From Swiss-Prot:
<keyword id="KW-0843">Virulence</keyword>
<feature type="compositionally biased region" description="Low complexity">
    <location>
        <begin position="157"/>
        <end position="172"/>
    </location>
</feature>
<comment type="function">
    <text>Transcription factor; part of the gene cluster that mediates the biosynthesis of pyrrocidines, fungal natural products containing a macrocyclic para-cyclophane connected to a decahydrofluorene ring system that show potent antibiotic activities toward Gram-negative bacteria.</text>
</comment>
<feature type="region of interest" description="Disordered">
    <location>
        <begin position="1"/>
        <end position="53"/>
    </location>
</feature>
<keyword id="KW-0805">Transcription regulation</keyword>
<protein>
    <recommendedName>
        <fullName>Transcription factor pydF</fullName>
    </recommendedName>
</protein>
<feature type="compositionally biased region" description="Basic and acidic residues">
    <location>
        <begin position="1"/>
        <end position="18"/>
    </location>
</feature>
<dbReference type="GO" id="GO:0005634">
    <property type="term" value="C:nucleus"/>
</dbReference>
<feature type="region of interest" description="Disordered">
    <location>
        <begin position="239"/>
        <end position="262"/>
    </location>
</feature>
<feature type="region of interest" description="Disordered">
    <location>
        <begin position="143"/>
        <end position="177"/>
    </location>
</feature>
<keyword id="KW-0804">Transcription</keyword>
<feature type="compositionally biased region" description="Basic and acidic residues">
    <location>
        <begin position="143"/>
        <end position="153"/>
    </location>
</feature>
<feature type="compositionally biased region" description="Polar residues">
    <location>
        <begin position="243"/>
        <end position="260"/>
    </location>
</feature>
<feature type="compositionally biased region" description="Polar residues">
    <location>
        <begin position="20"/>
        <end position="35"/>
    </location>
</feature>
<keyword id="KW-0539">Nucleus</keyword>
């Protein structure tokens, strides 16, 4: 008997009982392929180590069989045993360990952390997310007010300083707009009504011109004081700072009373219509613009130029009105013919029968208004205050700008604004000489 041949061993293994085992895995197929190639390569050499090779192949088959693992729901498995119930060692092939679930809509972004699993129901009906704060719907002032209201010790009521910050610029802006409208009206009246006071219907025209002049001066003075009072160095605020410096927290009542006197003095002339001009009862000894000190801060350039422009136009209007009154007075008998000023009243006393008294009152009223306006501007040239007497704190407009705009010198042969004021005073003096009766 010789050595058992390989063919006999393979025949015995084939004739033996068939064992149920799974199909060859990919690793076993690769091992078989490598073994076949190795056998083909060794065909030229004598097979002297057949039993060793058989044992090595058997050990490799046993090792690979112990490392087999099953995949559930796999379609390439032919054995029916692999379609049974899944056990703990089965791994689902549709599980993704790395990639997160991608949301189906942009609104789902941020709902699930990286690597977490979201079901289809979660994506279709997500849980409510935290509300986002819209920056456009809330202004910075709203956040400041909310933070101030939530501050400890704050009862929700706005402090005087906060209300002052919210409303300090509103009156000034409204006053500037009204001043601009007044300047346009006066300029239009100067350009369109020039020479109409000498026409045939001069009585009505002169009466309307007088009313416009007084109303313009009174409105300008009120707006001027409103604008100056809103600056950082208004009389009330200066008195409040002085009270704090002196150790008192209450503002000076004298400055407040002075402001009220300025307000009341603006209503000295109450003009009902174009045919009736009434004067309220006023004390001749009280001079609100000359009593006390006014601490006004310098205004900005645009507001200062607007004030000076309107003031210059008012001076020109006053000159034309007084020149028309002077021309309306005849050489003789002017007391019975000048009926345009018949609406003046002092309290309940009517003076319509004496035109000289009417003109005298009109002159005094205009002079008072012009002096008060000049004193507030800080460049008075008035009959009661000379230039340079006002302190820098009393000027609402810088002296350099006043000299530049009003200036002592005119341009292109025209008199300067200061020259216009002096010419107006000269016209008033000449008119006073005519209507004044010495006692």
């Amino acid at each position: 008997m010789g050595r058992p041949q390989r063919a006999d061993k393979q025949r015995r293994e084939t004739d033996g009982p068939q064992k149920s085992r799974p199909s060859l895995t990919q690793a076993q197929k690769n091992s078989t392929t490598i073994r076949i190639h190795s056998d083909d390569h060794d065909q030229g050499r004598p097979n002297t180590n057949g039993y060793a090779r058989q044992e090595q192949h058997a050990w490799e088959d046993a090792s690979l069989h112990s490392l087999d693992f099953r995949l559930c729901h796999s379609s390439n498995l032919e054995d029916d045993e692999m379609h049974g119930t899944a056990t703990d060692d089965m791994i689902p092939v549709n599980f993704d360990f790395v990639s997160p679930q991608v949301p189906h809509a942009m609104s789902d972004l941020g709902m699930y952390d990286f690597g977490s699993e979201a079901t289809a129901s979660d994506l279709l009906d997500p849980e409510p997310c935290a509300q986002f704060i819209s920056l456009a719907s809330h202004s910075a002032a709203d956040h400041v007010e909310k933070a101030t209201a939530e501050r400890p010790g704050n009862d929700g009521s706005s402090s005087p300083s906060s209300s002052l910050l919210r409303t300090s610029s509103s009156p000034s802006q409204q006053a500037v707009e009204k001043l601009s409208d007044l300047n346009v009206q006066i300029h239009r009246q100067l350009t369109t009504d020039h020479g109409s006071l000498d026409s045939a219907g001069r009585r009505t025209q002169l009466s309307c011109a007088v009313v416009s002049m007084i109303e313009g001066l009174k409105t300008f003075r009120e707006l001027l004081f409103d604008i100056l009072s809103t600056t950082s160095r208004s009389p009330l605020q200066a008195a409040f700072r002085d009270g704090q410096n002196n150790g008192t927290s209450r503002p000076n009542t004298a400055a407040s009373q002075n402001m009220q006197q300025h307000r009341r003095s603006g209503s000295m002339l109450s003009l009902s219509d174009c045919d009736a001009v009434s004067l309220s009862n006023s004390n001749s000894d009280s001079r609100p613009f000359q009593e006390g000190s006014h601490h006004f801060g310098c205004l900005d350039m645009s507001t200062s130029l607007l004030l000076l422009s309107c003031y210059a136009n008012l001076i020109l209007l006053c000159r034309e009105v007084f020149a028309a009154i002077r021309r309306a007075l005849p050489i003789s008998g002017h007391q019975s013919t000048l009926l345009e000023l018949s609406g003046f009243r002092i309290g309940s006393v009517a003076v319509q029968e004496d035109s000289d008294l009417q003109i005298t009152i009109l002159i005094q009223v205009v002079v008072r208004l012009i002096d008060g306006i000049g004193h507030c501007l800080g460049y008075p040239y008035s009959s009661t205050t000379e230039r340079g007497e006002a302190s820098p704190s009393d000027r609402g407009i810088s002296l350099e700008l006043l000299d530049l705009v009003l200036g002592p010198k005119g341009r292109q042969g025209q008199p300067s604004h200061i020259g216009q004021i002096e010419a107006l005073r000269e016209d008033i003096r000449n008119l006073s000489k005519i209507v004044y009766k010495s006692i």
